[in-house]
C-alpha cells in the first residue's frame, strides 16, 4: 500500500464482531418510504462512481477527505439517533475504546442486479478508522469480496472489513441488500506521523 500507512489496529482481512440486536432498527429501515430514499440519496456527500446505483441515507460524515477527526451530524441523524446508537455500541463492544467516535454512519441500499465496482477506499480519512458493516436485509444472491475472498454476510452479524484492499459487492438476488455501514476510531490513539504534514501541505496549496 503506497502513501499514508493504515492504522495497525485495522483488520487486514475481516473481523467477525458477533451478532447484534437490530430488531427495532430493521423494522424502521424496512418502513422507510421510497420518496425518502430518493431525497436522501440525491443529497448524499458520498457520490462516487464505483458505487454505481447503490443508494444511501447518510447520518454522519467526515468534514473533509483528509482527516477523520472532524465529522458532523447530517439532518437524518437526529430522528434516527435513538435507533442507531444501541446498534453501533453493540457492534463495537469488543474494541474497548473509552471514547470511540463514529465519523461516518450510513445505510446503503443495493437493488437486485446492483454492483459496487472493485475499488479501495482511497481518501486518507478512510485509512485510520475501522470500517464496519451490519447487514439489515440481504438474500443468498448477495456476494461481497473482502479480504481476498468472496463472502456472504448474514443479517445482524457485525463485521469489520478491510476497506484498503480491493473489494466489491454484487446482488444477484431478487431483493434489496441494505447494510448499516460505519467507521469507528479511538480518539485516544495518537494520530499517525503522516497526518500533520498532509494537512499542512493541503493548506499550502
Task: Pin down the residues of each PLM region.
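Fe(II)/2-oxoglutarate
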Residues: 1-8, 197-205
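Short beta-strand His + acidic residue motifs that chelate non-heme Fe in jelly-roll/DSBH
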Residues: 118-119, 142-144, 161-162, 166-174
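A short secondary-structure junction signal
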Residues: 116-121, 143-148, 192-193
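Conserved short histidine dyad/triad with adjacent acidic residue
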Residues: 107-125
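A short hydrophobic beta-strand segment most commonly corresponding to one strand
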Residues: 129-135, 158-160, 175-192
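A short beta-strand-loop-beta hairpin characteristic of the jelly-roll/cupin
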Residues: 135-154
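Non-heme Fe(II)/2-oxoglutarate
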Residues: 1-97
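Tight coil/turn sites that cap or link beta-strands
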Residues: 112-113, 156, 164
Amino acid at each position: 500500500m503506497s502513501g499514508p500507512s493504515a492504522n495497525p489496529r485495522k483488520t487486514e482481512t475481516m473481523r467477525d464482531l458477533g451478532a447484534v440486536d437490530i430488531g427495532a432498527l430493521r423494522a424502521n429501515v424496512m418502513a422507510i418510504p421510497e420518496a425518502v430514499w430518493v431525497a436522501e440519496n440525491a443529497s448524499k456527500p458520498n457520490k462516487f462512481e464505483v458505487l454505481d446505483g447503490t443508494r444511501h441515507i447518510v447520518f454522519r460524515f467526515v468534514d473533509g477527505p483528509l482527516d477523520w477527526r472532524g465529522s458532523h451530524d447530517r439532518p437524518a441523524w437526529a430522528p434516527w439517533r435513538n435507533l442507531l446508537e444501541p446498534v453501533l455500541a453493540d457492534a463495537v463492544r469488543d474494541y474497548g475504546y473509552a471514547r470511540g467516535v463514529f465519523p461516518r454512519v450510513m445505510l446503503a441500499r443495493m437493488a437486485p442486479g446492483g454492483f459496487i465496482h472493485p475499488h479501495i477506499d482511497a481518501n486518507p480519512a478512510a485509512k485510520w478508522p475501522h470500517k464496519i458493516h451490519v447487514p439489515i436485509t440481504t438474500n443468498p444472491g448477495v456476494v461481497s469480496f473482502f479480504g481476498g475472498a468472496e463472502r456472504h454476510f448474514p443479517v445482524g452479524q457485525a463485521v469489520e472489513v478491510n476497506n484498503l484492499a480491493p473489494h466489491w459487492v454484487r446482488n444477484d438476488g431478487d431483493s434489496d441488500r441494505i447494510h448499516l455501514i460505519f467507521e469507528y476510531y479511538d480518539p485516544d490513539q495518537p494520530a499517525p506521523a503522516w497526518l500533520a504534514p498532509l494537512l499542512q501541505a493541503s493548506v499550502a496549496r
